[in-house]
């Protein structure tokens, strides 16, 4: 209605999803309204260098800097969603069961790939053990079938996850399993753990 064209370049790490999106968009939209370009990092770098009216990017800070430099060449306004940390604050008056259920849902829905997915919780020390148990209960209740959860998108991300958990454990954290994969789960599935 506003005459704004959308040109989408999805992540090269999700090539099957990108291809599916491209097929759907081509079927339901005219290319003058919405189009999709797929490809690797070379395509992404070229894409960001085009003179858009506005550019949105979601990804890492390192790639975000490259996108911003490329967009600056044409003074293209840019919106960067570079992640960060989303805390969940659970004060001593909170209903721990409700808080745990909300946090587990927020973290695990869509494979945790939402910009507001909680990354950590700040909980009063006197409530910590009870809260951890409520998180376990909520995880097992909401996601009783581990096959419903999303695995790592590729081997690099799977290795990164294992490295982050091991680094935390090496520094004194305790890894508390919340959901354990079943035998039928894809090899890319990582146990859902609380650190």
Label each residue range with its predicted role.
Residues 29, 62-195:
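ALDH superfamily catalytic-core signature
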């Amino acid at each position: 209605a506003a005459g704004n064209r959308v040109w989408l370049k999805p992540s090269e790490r999700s090539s099957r999803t990108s291809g599916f999106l491209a097929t759907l968009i081509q079927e339901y939209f005219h290319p003058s309204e919405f189009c999709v370009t797929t490809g690797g990092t070379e395509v992404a770098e070229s894409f960001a260098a085009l003179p858009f009216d506005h550019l949105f990017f979601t990804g890492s800070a390192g790639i975000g800097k490259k996108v911003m430099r490329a967009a600056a060449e044409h003074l293209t306004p840019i919106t960067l969603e570079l992640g960060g940390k989303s805390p969940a604050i659970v004060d001593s008056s909170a209903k721990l069961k409700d808080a745990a259920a909300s946090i587990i849902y927020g973290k695990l829905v869509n494979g945790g790939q939402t910009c507001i997915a909680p990354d950590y919780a700040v909980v009063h020390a006197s409530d910590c053990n009870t809260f951890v148990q409520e998180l376990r209960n909520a995880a097992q209740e909401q996601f009783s079938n581990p096959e419903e959860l999303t695995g790592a998108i590729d081997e690099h991300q799977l290795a990164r996850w294992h490295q982050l958990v091991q680094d935390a454990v090496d520094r004194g954290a305790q890894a508390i399993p919340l959901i354990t994969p079943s035998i039928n789960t894809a090899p890319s599935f990582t146990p859902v753990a609380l650190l």
